[in-house]
């Protein structure tokens, strides 16, 4: 079985990776596949630490979501917007223990850096012109919004 990766919203989106498969990802019922990954939204309210814990308890190797390219970010944003319309989500990017060394909770390399660092937030812009912002406090949430 592949590794599982999660996105939590204050509500929750779950992602898992099916290693060794190519274009034809066979996801469980109720899940959506994209590039060797399966995605599912869970509408559960929780803080960041509880969301990460929830994710790790779902499947071996599961964590809050990590993003690695703009296409994956677009896919995730579309899934989130279709479920939440407008909402707050948790992701695995954190600096909880690293003192300014940002990393993903699943240990993946921080290879997608399409953000602008401002005084108090990160802003990811996807190809579809969605914005994903992240406050720099460890327990702040990602917010999704369309640019005005």
Curated annotation (Swiss-Prot):
Look up the signal peptide feature and give its range: 1-23
Q: Which GO terms describe its cellular component?
A: extracellular region
Transmembrane stretches in the record are: none
State which tissues express it.
Expressed by the venom gland.
Q: Keywords for this entry? A: Disulfide bond, Hemostasis impairing toxin, Secreted, Signal, Toxin
InterPro entries, alphabetized: C-type_lectin-like, C-type_lectin-like/link_sf, C-type_lectin/snaclec_domain, CTDL_fold
In this chain the C-type lectin domain maps to 34-148
Q: Where in the cell is it found?
A: Secreted
* GO MF annotations, alphabetized: toxin activity
What modifications does the entry list under PTM / processing? Answer: Contains disulfide bonds.
The family assignment reads: Belongs to the snaclec family.
Quaternary state and partners of this protein? Heterodimer; disulfide-linked.
Q: Which PANTHER family match?
A: MANNOSE, PHOSPHOLIPASE, LECTIN RECEPTOR RELATED (PTHR22803)
Task: Spell out the note in the miscellaneous section.
Answer: Shows greater sequence similarity to the beta than alpha subunits compared to other heterodimer snaclecs.
Query: What job does this protein perform?
Result: Interferes with one step of hemostasis (modulation of platelet aggregation, or coagulation cascade, for example).
Protein name stated in the entry:
Snaclec 4
Naturally occurring in which organism (per UniProt):
Echis pyramidum leakeyi (Leakey's carpet viper)
């Amino acid at each position: 079985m592949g590794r599982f990766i999660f996105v939590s919203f204050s509500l929750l989106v779950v992602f898992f990776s099916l290693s060794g498969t190519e274009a034809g990802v066979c996801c469980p019922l109720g899940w959506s596949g994209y590039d060797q990954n399966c995605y599912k939204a869970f509408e559960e309210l929780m803080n960041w630490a509880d969301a990460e814990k929830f994710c790790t308890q779902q499947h071996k190797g599961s964590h809050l979501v990590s993003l690695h390219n703009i296409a994956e970010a677009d896919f995730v944003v579309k899934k989130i917007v279709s479920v939440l319309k407008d909402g707050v989500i948790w992701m695995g990017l954190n600096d909880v223990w690293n003192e300014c060394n940002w990393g993903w909770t699943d240990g993946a390399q921080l290879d997608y850096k399409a953000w602008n660092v401002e005084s108090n937030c990160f802003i990811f812009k996807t190809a579809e012109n969605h914005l994903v912002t992240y406050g720099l406090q460890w327990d702040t949430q990602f917010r999704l919004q369309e640019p005005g």
